[in-house]
Amino acid sequence: MRAVALVAAFLAAACATQPAAPRGAPELGVEFTWKDVPPCSNVSPRIIVRDAPAGTARFRVELVDVDSAISRHGGGEVAATPGGVIPAGALKSYRGPCPAQQPITYEMRVQALDASGRVLARGTERLTYTPVRLRR
């Protein structure tokens, strides 16, 4: 029981430190593809972020398996670029899709951060990754 209380306290603290985007904040356009991404690779795909607001210093990126509440695939933070392009392989804590039997839907979540780490905007894109042996 004590362990459950400790885990609950840790999760509450983690949620409290996650900065929220201001109400009415702009939405980012997020674009990526699984093309040329080998299965079970830790090399992140190229990501294009559009409509980043003025003052954006960094992008925080996370890949999430939307079919499993506990399956997060990491990501990382990278410096914002004028064109909003995050090059392939730029996310150092990324674990790519590795579905065993069936296609899985993933969501790429991107936050635009200012220099102090405040969230200015958010955006997502969902794509399904099909295991190589099931592709036609």
List the predicted regions and their residue ranges:
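N-terminus-centered regions that define maturation/targeting leaders and the start
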Residues: 15-136
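Bacterial N-terminal signal peptides
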Residues: 4-14
